[in-house]
A protein has these predicted regions:
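Extreme N-terminal, non-catalytic leader segments
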Residues: 1-30
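ATP-dependent NMP and nucleoside kinases share a basic, alpha-helical "lid"
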Residues: 70, 74-77, 93-152, 158
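Conserved beta-strand scaffold positions in the cores of enzyme catalytic domains, especially
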Residues: 61, 127-131, 176-178
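Conserved substrate/cofactor phosphate-moiety recognition/catalytic segment
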Residues: 46-94, 98
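The conserved Walker
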Residues: 37
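Small-molecule kinase domains that catalyze NTP-dependent phosphoryl transfer to phosphate-bearing small molecules
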Residues: 133, 141-192, 200-206
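Conserved lysine of the Walker
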Residues: 41
Length: 206
């Protein structure tokens, strides 16, 4: 466990963010997508990354499944572990954004307090909160990963939306963008997402 006595920050000696953004010719940003399993957030995150990459934007995708097999492999799904999961992800996302990288995070992130914590860690100016809204019934019908069937059979515990609550943004204005994948297709959702992200990653003209 770290303590103030054995930590010696060297932030003043580090290469500044502006220099890194100038090299990449872009602004760092964290695009934080969240929603139920099966809502389409990972599909949109991947599609957004490919589109930005095709335009020469340097990106990094942080996805729930990948993070939990590496960085957060020691965490479960208790309330405390869910909070630590999001805290670590937000800290990593902040590091990427500070390096000028457009960081796309895709996680269930089920509670308002967790999203507020992530926004606080990253910083308001660098955080774009995107709620991928989709009804439980539609997500259960899609069941892309077979998790809803396993949860129904009791094979998956603490499953969000069934055993563990998912909180929509409250107030709804807490989310910077809401994409309703019940009502619109992937193409329309991606276009809305891209239009929200693109202006925020462009460097101001000198």
């Amino acid at each position: 466990m770290s303590s103030p006595e054995n930590i010696h920050p060297t932030f003043g000696q580090l290469l500044g963010r502006e220099a890194k953004e100038a090299l990449l010719k872009q602004r760092g940003l964290v695009v934080w997508l969240y929603g139920l399993s099966g809502s389409g957030k990972s599909t949109l995150a991947n599609a957004l990354e490919r589109r930005l990459h095709g335009e020469g934007v340097f990106t990094q995708l942080l996805d729930g499944d990948n993070i939990r097999t590496g960085l957060n492999s020691n965490l479960g799904f208790s309330d405390d572990d869910r909070q630590e999961n999001i805290r670590r992800i937000a800290e990593v996302a902040k590091l990427f954004a500070d390096a000028g990288v457009v960081t796309i995070a895709s996680f269930i992130c089920p509670r308002n307090e967790l999203r507020a914590m992530a926004r606080g860690i990253v910083g308001q100016a660098d955080f774009l909160e995107v709620y991928v809204e989709c009804s439980f019934e539609t997500c259960e019908r899609r069941d892309v990963k077979g998790l809803y069937a396993k949860a129904k059979a009791g094979e998956v515990k603490q499953f969000t939306g069934r055993d563990s609550a998912f909180e929509p943004p409250e107030p709804r204005e807490a989310a910077d963008l809401i994409l309703n994948t019940d009502e619109q297709g992937e193409g329309e959702s991606l276009e809305q997402l891209y239009r929200a992200v693109n202006p925020r990653v462009a460097l101001p003209q000198a």
